[in-house]
Structures are given as C-alpha cells and as structure tokens.
Amino acid sequence: MDFLEFTHRKEIYTYKNTILGYTIVVDFAGKGKITYPDGVIVNDETTSNLTKNENFVVLECVYRLLKLGYKPECIELEPKWEAPHDIGGGGKADVLVKDNAGESFLLIECKTWGKEFDNYWKKTEQDGDQLFFYAVQKRSTKYLCMYASNWDNDELVRKSNIISLKDNTATLESFDEPISFEKANDKSSLFAAWNITYGKYSFKNGIFEDTCIPYLIEEKGRDISNITEIGHDDIQKKYHEFTTILRQHNVSGRENAFDKLVNLFLAKIVDEIRNSDKLQFYWGGPQYDDYYKLQDRLQVLYKEGMEQFLGEEVSYIDESTIEETFKLFLNDPDATKDTILKYFRQLKFYTNNDFSFIDVYNEKLFYKNAQVLVQMVKMLQDVKLVTEKPNQFLGDLFEGFLDDGIKQSEGQFFTPTPIVRFLVSTLPLEEIIKSKGKSYIKNVGLCMWSWSFFK
C-alpha cells in the first residue's frame, strides 16, 4: 500500500488524487472494506472486501486505471449476467471500462498470480471461457484482458494477456469464408473468429504501462525490457511446448526441427544485441503482422548472425532492398513492379529455407510451415538469451532441446550435463595453464569416451 502512495492512520489506508479529485479508502479492520471513488459503479460487494487475494488484484487494477487517466464514472465493477454452469465467476466480470459514450470498451478479468492465472488462460484458449461469455453480453466491447499483479522482491509486477476484438480487413480477405468478430452473435462464433481467423493471438502490453494512453490500446514496440531470463520452472514448460508444436503439426523430422530451432536461436541472439530498443524477433499477430514479414525479419537476422559469428556469407535479399531497387526505375509502371514482386515472393518463400520445419515447395506448404514457425517464435520471443551473467538454466534448456532433437546413435551419445560439470571440475586446468601456458590446451572433449584418454 505504501508503494501505491496510500497514506495510513492505524488500519485505514487512503489514496487521494487532488488533481482529478477522487479518493480510494481501504479499511483493514475486520474482514476489510474497500471504498472506491464516487462515480465508480459497484454492482456487488464481493470484490469490495479483503477476504480473497483476487480482490487485491482488482483494487490494484482499478487504482492503475485511474492513475493512467480513466475517469471513475467510466469504470464499473462486477456487472452480472445469467451464466451457464460451466462459466466460472457466477457470471460476474471483475472490471468493465466504458467509453465516453457509456458503451463497453474493455472487459478485464482479474486473477491471482501464477497457477490461477495460467489455468484460466488455458481455459480461455480452449473455448473462450469467462472472457468471451462476457464479451457476448456486451457486444460493443473492443478488448478483453486477463490481468494479474503481485508483490515480488520489493517490486510490483504485472501480467496481462490482451485480446483485440477488432477485425482486420487484410486478414479477413486471406480467407475464402472468413469468420469475423463483427458478425459473431454468440460465444462460440466469437471464439471461432479469435481461434481460426486470428490464431488465438493476444499481446501482453498496451493497457497498464506508464506510456499508455486511455482508450488507445495497442501492442507497444517490444524492447529488451519486455523479455526475461529463463528460470528453472520454465525449462520443462518449454520442452513440453516444443514437442507439442511438433506433434500438433505432424512434424516427424526431429533432427531437421532442431536444426531450424538453432537457426532461430541465432536470429534471436542477433536481435537482442543489435535491436535491443526495438526487437524484431516476435510474432505481431495476424492483425498487425503477416507470415511474409515475419520470415523476412528472421532471414535478415539469421544472415547477420551467420556472418558475424560464423564468418559464413548467406545470400538473401530482403523486401526493403527490392522496394528501393524499384525506385531507381521511375518510368516503370506499378503493374510491372507488382508482377515481378509476385514472382520474387514465390522464389523466395515457396521453397525450403533456413526456417522450414517441413518441406516447402508451394504456397500451401509455405502457410502450413508458417503456422509451425509462428508457434516456435512465440515459444522463444519472451526468453532472454543474451545475459550479463552466465545462466545455467539457459544451457540446460538448449541441452534438453539437443537431447530431444538429435537421434543418438553409435558415436553420437551425449553425456548428461551434471556428469560433464563433474568431469570439467576435476580437470586441473588452472595448474596446467600456470605450468605450460594457455596455448597448451587446444581442445577438451566433454564426453565419457574422451575421458578415458585424459586418464
């Protein structure tokens, strides 16, 4: 509460915004009571007490919205509708944000950090669950958000998964029979639009950050601060995600898949080093990105990585280079340019390349592979590979992918990482360097077979 700039007298904490003229009062006596500012509509007292941890998340969410400039009269808590038995929450949404005309603009479902948030988001991805039920009740809603906040290591951390319910014309035109948000009239059709047309795309920032403007919700450009170092608990999740993607798309060539994964690692490392202020390694969703732009960005990063780290020149011409070349021919009609670009796209994308998890030799297979590629990129885009200090978990992650991706046959067996660590720690490397110099050590074979030669 002190971090949120509440002042307190005994058990009563108060936040006053003298500029906008509103007050939030939290009384910790007894079961606790939260008094929201005048103008905020409170339909039920369920979230206005301190008996549940989720209520603290709702409190912090409302505080943050007000702090960013949303007016109290545009915020409504716990609007309620008759809900089927499979919808949790009793048919009550946590926070509804209305626009200046009083229409529903944003629906927010607050969850506690960790398991509850993850479980409910999984349900959302399965059938739409609470969020899509609420959205059908308020069809003017433009955005849905699942939100959590937590106090961790003396710092307030926030997590949000945001879904846009606004249609994208270009995306709809790419389907023969598109399913749109606009024409959806029930939960299943609204979810089908998100699931099929927009590939369940969600983004993680655009509402609660310091730079956000009320009612201007859009994914902000990603920078190095948006990604985090991997921890022990994340490793198994990434293994499972990797194998799930391969299984879902019937990718049988594990060794090829691992090769392409290594290429993605290389592209991501280059991105973090060269584009830390504006990362390029991410999937921006079908409403803002497309498969061609994504692969073009990845190829440019991969080309730079091969040249910088491996000294290998990779032939690749990106889209912007072609655009610039055409500017030299001012008298050429646009039709000629479009035709040549079409042929160029076929040659560049509709063949096997450095990110082909499956064989690609036509447009249909390009799109099929692109679906795999997008999921692989999403798996890695929030992981920080370039760290200031060695990250053992990152090494363990790569080792796990290696074990899973490369068939171990005679002469190819990989020694488990703990054994390798033990072997290296027992080598008298420091004494050897002191007595014979650094140039003496040429190579160290970290496998059980080579160990017999050291002995």
What are these regions (language model features)?
Residues 415-455:
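Conserved S-adenosyl-L-methionine
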Residues 266, 273-403:
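Long recognition/docking surfaces used for binding and targeting
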Residues 101, 110-121:
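Short beta-strand-loop-alpha-helix junction that forms the active-site gateway
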Residues 118-174, 180:
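Nucleic-acid nuclease catalytic cores
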Residues 12-22, 46-50, 73-102:
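Active-site metal-binding core of divalent-cation-utilizing nuclease and nuclease-like domains
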Residues 1-66, 169, 204-243:
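Charged, often low-complexity linker/regulatory segments
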Residues 198-279, 283:
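Non-catalytic accessory regions of SAM-dependent methyltransferases
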Residues 31-37, 96-108:
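Active-site beta-strand-loop-beta-strand hairpin of nuclease catalytic cores
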